[in-house]
């Protein structure tokens, strides 16, 4: 790839993993260059001011961690929020062009699967049986687990323990 330079990157559209959201939900699309201070200022202002009852932080790739951090900070500052977290992979299409046009190389298009996260914080109760639900006040990682399976499990095959 040393003979190519990146021309652009486009995130391919994908359906939201939370289609049942009320229309007045505040959606915070976190990007890699987003300032946490700015994101929190808007989200906390709306939640504490009472103009929003739900907020969704979404981020993909390197911004996924920043989206989770924003949600955790909001949960600390606004007590009693219910949380629903969804994880998916999104497709990203990268365009690469030859570094010098006289090399005879063709432009390339590469599709990558990048991790993405959506974190819904709500003042209203959410379905506790939905996969990814965490009740208010629960420590991270200790959300209620529904009795049924939450989706596909790892596709890894069991290790062969024979010597």
From Swiss-Prot:
Record bears the keyword Nucleus: yes
GO cellular component: nucleus; ribonuclease MRP complex
Keywords: Nucleus
MF annotations from Gene Ontology: RNA binding
Subcellular location: Nucleus
Region (Disordered): 1-22, 129-163
Protein name: Ribonuclease P protein subunit p25-like protein
């Amino acid at each position: 790839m040393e003979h190519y330079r990146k021309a652009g990157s486009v995130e391919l559209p994908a359906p939201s993993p939370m289609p049942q959201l009320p229309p007045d939900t505040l959606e915070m699309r976190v990007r890699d260059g987003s300032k946490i201070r700015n994101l929190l200022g808007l989200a906390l202002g709306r939640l504490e001011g009472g103009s929003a009852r739900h907020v969704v932080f979404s981020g993909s790739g390197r911004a996924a961690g920043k989206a989770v951090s924003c949600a955790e900070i909001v949960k600390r500052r606004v007590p009693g929020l219910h949380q629903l977290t969804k994880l998916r992979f999104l497709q990203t299409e990268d365009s690469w062009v030859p570094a010098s046009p006289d090399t005879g190389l063709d432009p390339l298009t590469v599709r990558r699967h990048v991790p993405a996260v959506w974190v819904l914080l709500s003042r209203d109760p959410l379905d506790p049986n939905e996969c990814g639900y965490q009740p208010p006040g629960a420590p991270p990682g200790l959300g209620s687990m529904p009795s049924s399976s939450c989706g596909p499990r790892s596709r890894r095959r069991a290790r062969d323990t024979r010597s």
